[in-house]
Regions:
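The tetratricopeptide repeat
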Residues: 8, 39, 75-79, 121-125, ...
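TPR-adjacent "capping" and linker segments in tetratricopeptide-repeat scaffold/adaptor proteins
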Residues: 1-7, 28-35, 162-168, 195-197
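Structural register within alpha-helical repeat arrays
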Residues: 12, 43, 79, 83, ...
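Alpha-helical protein-protein interaction modules
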Residues: 93, 97, 103-121, 136, ...
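N-terminal leader/linker segments that initiate helical-solenoid repeat arrays
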Residues: 1-22
Length: 272
């Protein structure tokens, strides 16, 4: 199975949907025969962000044998994570668990050596998702591991240590990262607010969310997620990524993705 290259007309429709045009979903029907799996992915992405979990899970289950039609492995992982999250909400674990086992079997047949060596990313991620489905366990991530240092350093100290030029955008982002690792959460979010208009990468948004979460400022976490959604950093893997499916990969986001009020704000930020 080879990765599918989508024509410009299809990509343009995806862009319209990404920008909030629900009417453009119907335009995908013209491509149903040629790109049925890409159509499923687009529809499922929209459904996950409308909390239409029954439809989203059904569509993603149909996609499971066809992930190799995408160039990037993160597409499969993001959709599978979203599917598992939604399935737990609507009680469809009994369908999703065997689908994950079947995906592992397909991968083992196609890439046995890589699977046995632990170098097949999707095979490994299926293991993670099975633990999530069966035991409600996800790997410890930065958000749950985070503890500020006992003796946090100030921004001035970190600038001097790193010989940073706070007038340069690259150095300003580097300072934000250093504050997250070596400074206090208060200083980290204060500095994030000062530089948030830069073209920040996803790592920096995640760090700001983690620090605001640690400080118990849930409204500020949502504000960062909104800015992250508006950045469109999440859409680079494929035109079919019409919604930020990567958000489901961050457990700290789950409470915002399942709450209609916060999800509405995230959608509005996407359409921005």
């Amino acid at each position: 199975m080879e990765a599918i290259k989508l024509p410009k007309k299809y990509r343009d429709i995806c862009e319209e949907i990404k920008n909030g045009s629900s009417e453009s979903l119907a335009k995908l029907d013209a491509f149903e025969e040629k790109f049925p799996h890409q159509n499923l992915a687009v529809k499922a992405g929209v459904e996950f962000f409308e909390r239409q979990y029954e439809e989203a899970v059904s569509h993603t289950l149909l996609l499971m044998p066809f992930w190799d039609e995408w160039y990037y492995s993160n597409v499969a992982n993001e959709y599978m994570m979203a599917m598992c999250f939604a399935a737990k909400k609507i009680g469809r674990e009994a369908e999703v668990i065997p689908a994950l086992h079947e995906e592992q079997s397909r991968l083992m047949e196609a890439e046995e050596e890589k699977c046995l060596k632990g170098s097949c990313q999707r095979y490994n991620y299926c293991k993670i998702l099975l633990n999530y489905m069966l035991q409600n366990i996800l790997p410890e991530l930065r958000a749950t591991d985070y503890q500020p240092p006992k003796a946090p350093k100030t921004a001035s100290e970190l600038i001097a240590e790193g010989k940073l030029n706070p007038e340069k955008d690259f150095d300003r982002m580097k300072l934000l990262n250093l504050l997250f690792m070596k400074g206090s959460p208060e200083d980290t979010v204060d500095y994030y607010e000062r530089i948030k208009d830069l073209n920040l990468g996803e790592l920096y948004y995640e760090q700001a969310c983690i620090c605001y979460g640690y400080l118990g400022q849930k409204d500020k976490v949502l504000e960062v997620i909104e800015r992250w959604a508006k950045s469109k950093l999440w859409d680079v893997a494929s035109p079919t990524q019409v919604r930020p499916m990567s958000f489901f990969m961050y457990p700290f986001m789950h409470e915002y993705l399942e709450n209609e009020d916060s999800l509405k704000r995230i959608r509005e930020a996407i359409f921005g």
